[in-house]
Amino acid sequence: GKKYTFKLREDAKWSNGDPVTAKDFVYAWQRAVNPDTAAKSGYIMLDVKNAEKINKRELSPDQLGVKAIDDYTFEVELDNPVPYFLDLTVYPLFFPLNEKYMKEQGEKFGLEANTTLYNGPFVLNEWKHEQSFQLKKNPSYWDQKEVKLEEVNFNVVKDTGAAVNLYNTSAIDRVGLSAELVDKYKGQQDFKTINDPTVFFLRFNQKNPALANKNIRKAISSAYDRDGIGEVILNNGSKGAYGLVPSDFVKGPDKQDFRKENGKLSKVDVKEAKKFWEAGKKELGKDKIELEFLNFDNEESKKIGEYVKGELEKNLPGLTVTIKMQPFAQKLKLEDSGQFDISFTGWGPDFPDAITFLDMFITDGSQNKMSYSNAQYDSLIKKAKQEGSDVKGRWNDLLKAEKILFEDAAIAPVFQRGRSILERETIKDVYIHKYGGELSFKWASVEK
């Protein structure tokens, strides 16, 4: 269907005592699609009626297909049926906002603990930027009797060794491990590996004449060992990736895992890579090719970047790769403005459907960023976004679209992320989510 009616709980309150009402949802959704807001994830809401036209400034935000029927009834109309619409609503972009409070705070909203409003089990009590933050139990929360923890403290520690020392001295209860520490702690009872549906890959900017050549892209895709990256460099449960949609993420109508069903679409074969490379150079009339590799500025990415550079330069004669490491925000800016040749990047799901990965690469899509375009791919994705009833047909369209992406060697997969952590056995019921918010502490407790 195209119409959804949500009944809100009447006992939900904001942390300042205001009730949470349907108007808060109307305001939040209109704000999200308003082009003046420039919401990074605004595209996720474009299936709501008129959202696209509002985003293009053809209609005003109050024309969005959302209505407060009364204080506790919220109605949503879509442009066309979206099979995964209810899954979308757990994404933070769809959360309500208190208009009066936001307008009082103006530009300061959300920048400090005391310029933010809450309606969940915890409130942000203290926030020392780049150092630490503290959650405290929210006394206004409708279900606070279920919340067992009084507070949750987070430390921002960039050096993993220092963070593990804090764990070993009982100063913290949970810590992530880097590759070199995994083997040391693997045998401990508090060691855990978490499967993460986030996939890292190389984006090829086709504005670069060399990367506009399919043989060159295929050569690069086939010339580096992914399993080595997952098992040796990362050593934390990460696995080499051979497609875009991760494994253990979504199952089709016949209960088959998407990744299993579509198989390995991007193979590593140095012999083949050399053939593609020579063919590409010949087509370009070039013997030497120089490419810049845009990378994150953390330790892990640095190792991966250097490894990929080494493999590519060794296996593809005449190639020179220069690595450019950038802080996260600056890297995003360069990607958004197309100022890169190859970019090492990652994507995690916004909702549990393969389209959350595949939708990225439609022509001129806000997450495409690399001038990739294939009309057949576009039409399969468009169809899959609108197909509500033919579940099997839709699944097959998504499988087909992913195959096209790799026939074109539009991107080159690197690894699917795993995480190794130490977590005290006294900690119970911290829930880890594959999409939406990462962790839920509502039901968590610490056993004495």
Q: What is each model feature region?
A:
Residues 113, 139-184:
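Ligand-site clamp/hinge motif
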Residues 421-448:
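Long beta-strand-rich cores associated with HINT superfamily self-processing modules
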Residues 129, 277-349, 419:
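Ligand/substrate-recognition segments at binding pockets and active sites
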Residues 48, 78-147, 151, 161:
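Gly/Pro-rich hinge or "lid" segments in bacterial periplasmic/extracellular proteins
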Residues 5-7, 20-26, 40-100:
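Surface-exposed binding/hinge segments that line
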Residues 239-279, 300-303:
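Structural transition elements
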Residues 266, 318-333, 359-425, 448:
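Extracytoplasmic/peripheral linker and loop segments enriched in polar/acidic and small residues
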Residues 21-28, 71-77, 120-121, 149-151, ...:
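Alpha-helical secondary-structure segments
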